[in-house]
Amino acid sequence: MGLRVAQTGFVALVLLQSCAAYKLVCYYTSWSQYREGDGSCFPDAIDPFLCTHIIYSFANISNNEIDTWEWNDVTLYDTLNTLKNRNPNLKTLLSVGGWNFGSQRFSKIASKTQSRRTFIKSVPPFLRTHGFDGLDLAWLYPGRRDKRHLTTLVKEMKAEFIREAQAGTEQLLLSAAVSAGKVAIDRGYDIAQISQHLDFISLLTYDFHGAWRQTTGHHSPLFRGQEDASSDRFSNADYAVSYVLRLGAPANKLVMGIPTFGRSFTLASSKTDVGAPVSGPGIPGRFTKEKGILAYYEICDFLQGATTHRFRDQQVPYATKGNQWVGYDDQESVKNKAKYLKSRQLAGAMVWALDLDDFRGNFCGQNLRFPLTSAIKDVLAAA
């Protein structure tokens, strides 16, 4: 009896360790609180056991120091970090930057020794005060002149985290969000250098295609499509992962991005297949209210009465209804992506974003909260 109990305990421990071997890094966006009705998401809606890391987006920089962005950020910081009372193993990070912050503001700070130093010194006390375990740098689309400065910023930030931890506290984590487009990578990131100083890199393997193009196409294909033009041969997760690994990123520090949103188009003709001409972005979702983007829970509504298709080569679905075309991810495609990243021995998966998944479980017909993120977790936890 005692031996059987011991064996059972050992098996449970092994399963826990196999699950913990992969990171599931999940972003939460503070502006999701402003969506109407069932689209409004606050940090207390998050299952504290769903992800290994939750990243709060975004912090601001004021007078070269890290700062809050929203009027109630401090309250939301506290709500998020209270989740660790229920799951002490959960790690939380604060992401600084983002799309609206812009690359030029980062450039000005990182290119000058004094402003860079001021910013770096401001980070540890801010993170400690608000209960975060680390910082995520979301310097998106740095320019050619920024490549060296970004590397210096990462190197000096890590050195500051090491120095600060000498007081006996657990060392703060440092991660970065990195664009997955080949042109953006070549222009702005010294992958081999920054990898040395980061705990993990979140590769943004989505937004490969959008309304800025003249034709329909999936924004987050796993593999290259057989009919892809030569210009699109780089626009898939498999190429991006392989390229970043080739540039020197260790597989055990690379986290592959998986979106819980889709990109939509308004068709310009009766053609509905991939490569069909478009007149612009798709109509805004009822909750997210942004042209060309739909949350997964909005896509579940859209699928009622829509015609669905699946790219067998790219391993992702799309749907059409009237003059609307939506490329998205479903449970099957995110599972395939999770299996893929395991086969490449990557560090894990990143989800953008928890508040775009069906976080209430009200929309996608399964009475399951976070269906996409949960599907990823199931694959990562499997032996």
UniProtKB/Swiss-Prot annotation:
Disulfide bonds join C26-C51, C300-C364. Detected in smooth muscle cells in atherosclerotic plaques. Detected in regions of vascular occlusion in the aorta. Keywords: Antimicrobial, Apoptosis, Cytoplasm, Disulfide bond, Endoplasmic reticulum, Glycoprotein, Inflammatory response, Lectin, Secreted, Signal. GO terms for cellular component: cytoplasm; endoplasmic reticulum; extracellular region; extracellular space; perinuclear region of cytoplasm. One of its GO terms (molecular function) is chitin binding. It comes from the Eukaryota. Residues 22-383 form the GH18 domain. Gene3D superfamilies: 3.10.50.10, Glycosidases (3.20.20.80). The keyword ATP-binding does not apply. Its main location: secreted. Residues 1-21 form the signal peptide. Induction: Up-regulated in cultured aortic smooth muscle cells upon transition to a nodular, multilayered culture. It is found in: Secreted, Extracellular space; Cytoplasm; Cytoplasm, Perinuclear region; Endoplasmic reticulum. The keyword Membrane does not apply. Chitin binds at E70, W71, G97, G98, W99, N100, Y141, L204, T205, Y206, D207, R263, W352. InterPro entries: Chitinase_II/V-like_cat, Chitinase_insertion_sf, Glyco_hydro18_cat, Glycoside_hydrolase_SF, Glycosyl_Hydrlase_18. One of its GO terms (biological process) is positive regulation of ERK1 and ERK2 cascade. It holds the Pfam family Glyco_hydro_18. Glycans are attached at N60. SMART domains: Glyco_18 (SM00636). Residues 324-338 are annotated as: Important for AKT1 activation and IL8 production. Carbohydrate-binding lectin with a preference for chitin. Has no chitinase activity. May play a role in tissue remodeling and in the capacity of cells to respond to and cope with changes in their environment. Plays a role in T-helper cell type 2 (Th2) inflammatory response and IL-13-induced inflammation, regulating allergen sensitization, inflammatory cell apoptosis, dendritic cell accumulation and M2 macrophage differentiation. Facilitates invasion of pathogenic enteric bacteria into colonic mucosa and lymphoid organs. Monomer. Belongs to the glycosyl hydrolase 18 family. This is Chitinase-3-like protein 1. It comes from Sus scrofa (Pig).
